[in-house]
Regions:
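Residue-level marker for buried hydrophobic side chains located in beta-strands
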Residues: 13-15, 43-45, 121, 205
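Conserved beta-sheet core of the metallophosphoesterase superfamily
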Residues: 103-109, 121, 126, 130-140, ...
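C-terminal regulatory/interaction regions
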Residues: 3, 248-270
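Core catalytic region of metal-dependent phosphoesterases/phosphodiesterases
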Residues: 4-12, 23-115
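Catalytic core of the metallo-beta-lactamase
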Residues: 23, 28-29, 116-122, 128, ...
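Short glycine-/acidic-enriched loop or helix-start segments at secondary-structure transitions
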Residues: 54-56, 93-96, 132-133, 214-216, ...
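Active-site-proximal loop/helix segment associated with metal-binding centers of metalloenzymes
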Residues: 123-188
Length: 270
């Protein structure tokens, strides 16, 4: 890794989720490269930063996972405001929401105001599981089958790296082609947008489903940060207040901005 030789990128806010430290599928080297190269005024950790579920099944904690946490905590000491909104895989941290862990702020949820005065609800997203009807296939995918898929994903990408090809998400490819999975994603997005609408906010930022997205749903801005297992993505608010998705490519760890969606700037909520 050559993070020190690459230019530093300055942004206003960065939102990342679903890193899953403690899991073998975590792309910790890319998370670390991202954190070292991107200088942000505010860093939002939108849940599932540490995968306690995976650690309980089989303890796995290499040095690079420590390095990620140290880098995050280091940012709190050098001018970055870090706001942590725990998810379902690190739900133990929800017991101390509303407190400070050093300079790290821990919240059950948070309302972020962009430079363009858009008010965005920030929450992990597992809160919507009860409102979404999951099929049997998705229930299995969320446990054993999903673990198998990610294992296959790791092998496929090891081969692709040897052949000089960039990272490709097998799990994401399969989910995008299964009707029930897409129905679940649609229901999740609608439930998330409704949560922001009920509070008269302009939009919502969440994670949980490992599917990065920026779109407008009936006047509500829906943003999903994605993950660092499959997508290796982050939601970025640039210094002008514009939101976009970034994907961190392991082919030289090159930064790739996702195409900007056709979403108009939303008016500030009354």
């Amino acid at each position: 890794m050559t993070g020190t030789s690459r230019p530093i990128i300055h942004v206003r806010s960065a939102f990342i989720s679903d890193i899953h430290l403690g899991s073998r599928e975590c792309r910790a080297e890319l998370v670390l490269e991202f954190l070292r190269r991107v200088q942000m005024e505010q860093l939002f950790l939108v849940g599932d930063i540490v995968d306690v579920w995976s650690l309980r099944r089989s303890f796995y904690w290499p040095q690079i996972h420590n390095d990620v946490l140290r880098t995050i905590l280091g940012k709190t000491k050098h001018g970055t405001r870090v706001i942590y909104v725990p998810g379902n895989h690190d739900e133990q941290m929800r017991e101390i929401c509303g407190t400070l862990f050093g300079n790290l702020e821990i919240h059950r949820e948070y309302v972020h105001t962009t430079l363009r005065e858009q008010k965005l609800l920030v929450m992990h997203g597992d809160e919507f599981d009860g409102a979404v009807q999951c099929s049997r296939w998705l229930t299995a995918l969320g446990s054993g089958l999903y673990d198998v898929t990610l294992g296959a994903n790791r092998l496929v990408n090891a081969l692709r790296r040897r052949l000089g090809y960039p990272y490709w998400s097998l799990a994401g490819y399969l989910k995008s082609r299964v009707g029930n999975a897409m129905k679940y994603v649609h229901s999740f997005e609608q439930a998330a947008a409704q949560a922001a609408r009920r509070r008269e906010l302009d939009g919502i930022v969440c994670g949980h489903i490992h599917r990065p997205e920026i779109t407008e749903l009936d006047g509500i801005l829906y943003c999903n940060t994605g993950d660092w297992v499959e997508s290796c993505s982050a939601l970025i608010e640039d210094r002008g207040g514009e939101l976009e998705l970034w994907h961190w490519n392991d082919a030289g760890s090159a930064l790739q901005a996702a195409p900007k969606p056709a979403v108009k700037a939303l008016p500030r909520a009354a």
